[in-house]
């Protein structure tokens, strides 16, 4: 079992954690001009 040789500082741990981010959803413009999420059906036009 792997055991850390020395303690990881708060700063180093925080720097590593900065890469764990939530990506924002990117809505796309539909044919009728409304924005929707990709790969979702449009409720008004019933298009995918």
Curated annotation (Swiss-Prot):
GO biological process annotation, one example: translation
UniProt-recorded name of the protein: Large ribosomal subunit protein bL32
Bias-annotated ranges (Basic residues): 1-20
A molecular function (GO) term: structural constituent of ribosome
Gene (name only): rpmF
Keyword Ribonucleoprotein assigned: yes
Organism of derivation: Campylobacter jejuni subsp. jejuni serotype O:2 (strain ATCC 700819 / NCTC 11168)
Superkingdom of origin organism: Bacteria
GO cellular component: large ribosomal subunit
InterPro entries: Ribosomal_bL32 (IPR002677), Ribosomal_zn-bd (IPR011332)
Family in the record: Belongs to the bacterial ribosomal protein bL32 family.
Region (Disordered): 1-48
Keyword field: Ribonucleoprotein, Ribosomal protein
Pfam families, per the entry: Ribosomal_L32p
């Amino acid at each position: 079992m792997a055991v850390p040789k020395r303690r990881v500082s708060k700063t180093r741990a925080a720097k590593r954690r900065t890469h764990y981010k939530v990506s924002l959803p990117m809505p796309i413009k539909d044919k009728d001009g409304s924005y929707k999420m990709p790969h979702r059906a449009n409720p008004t036009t019933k298009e995918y």
